[in-house]
């Protein structure tokens, strides 16, 4: 549901059309989260509004975060562009063709996803009150601390409204270069669940930060004074290692930058896991702590980055990219940026790395807070 605040998802939907939303909430809670302009459009255009918790259903069926089959089935149930029974039959035939060699269990799991998408009780038609027609637009809060480039160009383009930008908006950017480190301003909040640090279980190996595809979980070293000045409730423990004597150790998550892949929790080698996946909304208190750790505590060069643990105390110069949740490529780029980023030049070959590395206007390559240096990146299609 984060996307309903990012994009105009109803744009182009004609009067009497149908809108299907994958929502983690029930009908009443979903209504509370919809922005007013969206409610007004639904009412004015007599839209048939449906919700389904494809996320929960996919997890219950063993499909993890995959919802596409569930949503496709729900689409056919709602639209009736072809008889639903025919759609189900064709989808299951495609499943046999695609997954038959992977075994009966995988096939049946996907069969169940098809059936779940059109099942009564899963697919819910939402009542659209007539009074929604009179709702005013929500008050838009402008953060004047956001750089001008972000407010005037990045935010507009990320909302899929780049065609609305006048040529004059690009004054100063005539050569096609964009500033580095713009991805950190997106704060997409797309995860359903994010990791919660269990301080008492942590063995301080930093493997969670090492495998994170988006640099959304990091270790920090604090002095007693820094810990005392941290937001209320901030937990830490004495850092392990003679070089780190006197410092306090903390693992910090950026909930709005996390994609919820769970790689960190999976890799945690502690006897009792030091990371437990929790609903995003329950972890929003961590956002202020993230800002404090990243901006105020910073990245201390106390130890040489000569092993996995030590490398993760270094600031990543590749962060919050648009890579898929759980990506296996980006942790390598992130690590290279931690080791050599201040003197890196990247001539990128086209592929996934060009998409998550520089989909205009977002740039995950950033600069070191101390030196202002970071990777220079360019990509040529040919």
What feature does the model see in each segment?
Residues 1-155, 228-232, 236:
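Active-site cofactor/cluster-binding pocket
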Residues 87-91, 100-257, 265-382:
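Ferredoxin-type iron-sulfur electron-transfer modules and their immediate structural context
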